[in-house]
Regions:
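Long, compositionally biased intrinsically disordered regions
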Residues: 353-356
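Juxta-kinase regulatory segment immediately upstream of eukaryotic protein kinase catalytic domains
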Residues: 1-26
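ATP-dependent phospho-/nucleotidyl transfer catalytic cores
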Residues: 27-31, 52-53, 59-63, 118-134, ...
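Conserved active-site aspartate in kinases
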Residues: 241
């Protein structure tokens, strides 16, 4: 996609019903890898909004994606109201275009959408305290619980086979066979690591196929920075980045949070000696998550959560390494070998999880381990 200029941004902003003219700043907002995110505000500075260009290379059906987002947020608003909450803060609120559409298509084929800005909130890039991590866990568990009766059949699949780990493995094998940039020679140990875990990739989908765990409506990208936390009270407010809300497994959402939160390093830490999986933080998160989502989960589903942590971390590493082999087209990179560093960090975490996996199972399912 072409870069976003101030004139392009202003043109997109003018298409939305912000209640009056808005001012734009062409500096990107936030830490997201995929979409282009900006903050705009009314000329009188009375209100801010998020304006975002959807990455249509990744999300090829932006209209369908926005149907998902609008349907899910409408459902969440009803739940939040019924629980006595504040739907203006506790879920995303979509701003329509002036013509009443959920997104705006620009002259270059770019797709734009807008949300109310949720003020006085923060999102964590790394876990700052156990309390913060438990708050994230409780918020994500509540989100899943609020969606337990959402009609999954109405959802568009925004990214086909997104958490299909065997398919991610197959895509890696294709990229390895093609070796388009001649990079495979640099990563022999990483290749061996993935090959040794081919069977692990099938564990969760085999459990689903056997009817041991249920298909749910899940977020599918529950990095800790996708939860907004009230800056004053420290309470969890809102789950954001709903682009990948689709039918999925509870293990996916649980696992991705552990992947990003239960360690003391950045996702792209180049020094592997600094990468440490924190079993205690895993336990903190598990207890928080199960406190809000666990009542409707079977023993088998709770047990699958530990596998989710392990497989989402493995899968993410496979994705980073696949992108490295293919030329770094999917994830934004800031330096050479950025995706390789990301992959190595994931694989280090997987190794460490494997060493304490019995304890991980015991924590999520103490009565049936």
């Amino acid at each position: 996609m072409k870069s976003v200029t101030l004139s392009l941004l202003q043109s997109a902003a003018n298409a939305f019903d912000f209640g009056g003219p808005v001012l734009c700043d062409a500096h990107h907002y936030g830490e997201g890898h995929i979409n282009d995110t900006f903050v705009v505000w009314r000329e009188d500075h009375s209100k801010r909004f998020i304006l975002q260009r959807i990455n249509t290379d990744t999300f090829t059906n932006p209209v369908g994606l926005m149907e998902n987002v609008c349907g899910v947020t409408r459902h969440l608003r009803a739940k939040i109201l019924a629980e006595g909450g504040d739907p203006a803060r506790e879920t995303l609120n979509v701003i329509p275009t002036l013509s009443g559409s959920t997104c705006y298509l620009d002259a270059d084929g770019g797709a734009w959408r807008a949300y109310d800005f949720v003020e006085d909130t923060i999102c964590l890039q790394q876990v700052g305290s156990e309390t913060d991590f438990r708050t994230v866990a409780e918020t994500l568990g509540k989100f899943q619980n609020q969606l337990k009766d959402y009609p999954a059949s109405t959802l568009h699949e925004t990214i086909a086979r997104f958490h299909d780990t065997p398919n991610r493995y197959a895509n890696f094998e294709k990229a390895l066979a093609a070796d388009a940039l001649g990079r495979a020679k640099n990563i022999t140990s990483e290749i061996e690591f993935i090959h040794a875990r081919e069977q692990d990739c099938h564990v969760l989908l085999d459990q689903l196929a056997a009817g041991e765990i249920p298909l749910r409506v899940t977020h599918n990208d529950t990095k800790i920075n996708n939860v907004l936390i009230d800056a004053a009270t420290g309470k969890g407010i809102c789950v954001i980045d709903l682009d990948t809300v689709m039918p999925g497994l509870a293990a996916y959402d649980f696992g991705d949070s552990i992947r990003t939160g239960a360690n003391d390093c950045a996702e792209d830490e180049p020094d592997q000696s600094k990468v440490h999986f924190d079993l205690h933080l895993y336990e903190v998160f598990a207890k928080g998550y199960l406190s809000t989502a666990g009542a409707s989960m079977s023993m088998a589903e709770k047990k699958s959560l530990a596998w989710g942590a392990r497989l989402m971390t493995l899968e993410c590493g496979i994705r980073f390494l696949t992108d490295y082999l293919e030329g770094d087209h999917y994830f934004h990179i800031a330096r050479p070998d950025h995706n390789l560093d990301r992959a190595r960090t994931q694989f280090t975490l997987v190794r460490q999880m494997e060493e304490v996996f019995d304890q991980m199972l015991e924590i999520v399912c103490p009565d049936n381990h």
